[in-house]
């Protein structure tokens, strides 16, 4: 799922991307990969690193791109442990912020909703 978010009074979703927006991608599909690699020219190695479920938090650079990998919680209802952590990649250059997570999360939608409620 791909969303284009713009900072106004909170993050506002719009139909198309433009420079200086946040592109949030959860559970990317083939069209998302094509968009990231062909249109935006995001390095393939960044997407491969984010896909590694054992990837540790770190930063990396390639050209004018910066990759920051963090680990965020996701619910695991079929496990004895209620939460596990998964990698999320924050990819930036001079005009874009792109977040890519191969799992559906509650954290980012909650963050977006919070910014809208607070108007920040």
How should these model regions be labeled?
Residues 1-120:
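Peripheral, non-transmembrane regulatory/ligand-interaction domains of membrane transport proteins
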